[in-house]
């Protein structure tokens, strides 16, 4: 049986708060500050890296095989690439954004002055009564534009609002928590795992438990572009557990109600010894952990290894439906993931 009391209420509320805090790759300071405040409130000292990620070091009963856990707070997003002659905006994705999924979505343009200007993402010349190809036209960065909720019809008028090339664009997350326990939102990847990590650490602290090994927590902020997982982690790490969303789809075992362990992704297999240990730990604690292989996937663990990291690496996370779209998970998967993290922290 599990040894820790995981507060599902805290976990879900923390996730909701994170989801409502914009953090596209490259513009994550507010979300990092939120996580920093949560950890500091638990009595855990934190530091920022030069790149803006968050590090926390927790003393363990031993330091013979130091550990790290990492989850990323950066999400999909976009930046202003061009102010068009008609005053509307052409965007560029900062990572793996799928353009059809953000059509008609509300958004905010964050200006250098701190103002947030509302608008929406639409197909250029998208009126069905005018353009007979509106329903079949491709949706991509060249065919879609931001329609600002301001009176502007020229590029000069848009610039007078304070908007300029390079401004970040925050798509509305549209967070909903259902009575049946589902959480539906954009950007559950990977804020769900950040919330799970916080809930696990909270459960461990409240139980007055100590990690089995000296442990580093890394909240990375450049995972979605491939260089988050190597940021300032100790050189003497023996193992790293990456916390990232589990895939759901045809041919996979994962679902929205369970935690999964990825044994191989696009970068190759993860460490068998560490993965086997985590699977055994889940079995002993009654956690139904689903093994899986992800066909189109990479993680901060892959980035850590590519940068020369020597530690063993494993990857776990809650099942998330429709990744990089309007995502959904369930509190059962979140609770199981947090429980497994807490168990791993203290496991001998």
PLM segments and residue spans:
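N-terminal hydrophobic/helix-forming segments and targeting peptides
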Residues: 1-348
């Amino acid at each position: 049986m599990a040894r820790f009391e995981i507060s599902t209420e805290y976990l879900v509320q923390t996730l909701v708060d994170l989801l409502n805090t914009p953090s596209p790759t490259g513009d994550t300071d507010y979300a990092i500050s939120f996580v920093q405040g949560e950890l500091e409130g638990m009595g855990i000292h934190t530091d920022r890296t030069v790149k803006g990620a968050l590090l926390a070091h927790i003393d363990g009963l031993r330091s013979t095989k130091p550990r790290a856990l990492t989850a990323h707070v950066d999400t999909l997003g976009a930046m202003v690439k061009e102010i068009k002659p008609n005053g509307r905006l052409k965007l560029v994705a900062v990572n793996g954004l799928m353009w059809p999924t953000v059509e008609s979505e509300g958004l905010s343009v964050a200006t250098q002055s701190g103002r947030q200007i509302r608008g929406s993402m639409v197909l250029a010349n998208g009126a069905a009564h005018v353009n007979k190809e509106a329903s079949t036209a491709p949706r991509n960065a060249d065919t879609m534009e931001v329609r600002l909720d301001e009176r502007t019809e020229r590029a000069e008028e848009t610039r007078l609002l304070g908007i300029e090339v390079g401004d970040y664009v925050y798509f509305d997350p549209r967070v909903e928590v259902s009575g049946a326990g589902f959480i539906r939102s954009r950007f559950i990847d990977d804020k769900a795992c950040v919330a799970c990590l916080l809930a696990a650490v909270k459960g461990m602290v409240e139980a007055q438990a100590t990690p089995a090994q000296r442990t580093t927590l890394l909240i990375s902020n450049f995972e979605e572009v491939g260089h988050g997982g190597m940021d300032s982690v100790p050189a003497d790490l023996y193992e790293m557990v990456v916390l990232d969303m589990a895939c759901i789809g045809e041919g996979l075992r994962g679902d929205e109600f369970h935690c999964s362990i990825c044994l191989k992704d696009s970068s190759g297999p993860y460490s068998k010894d560490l993965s086997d240990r985590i699977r055994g730990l889940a079995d002993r604690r009654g956690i139904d952990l689903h093994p899986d292989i992800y066909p189109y996937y990479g993680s901060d663990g892959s980035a850590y290894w590519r940068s020369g990291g020597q530690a063993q690496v494993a990857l776990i996370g809650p099942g998330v439906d429709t990744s990089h779209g309007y995502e959904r998970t369930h509190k059962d998967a979140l609770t199981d993931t947090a429980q497994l993290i807490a168990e791993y922290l203290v496991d001998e």
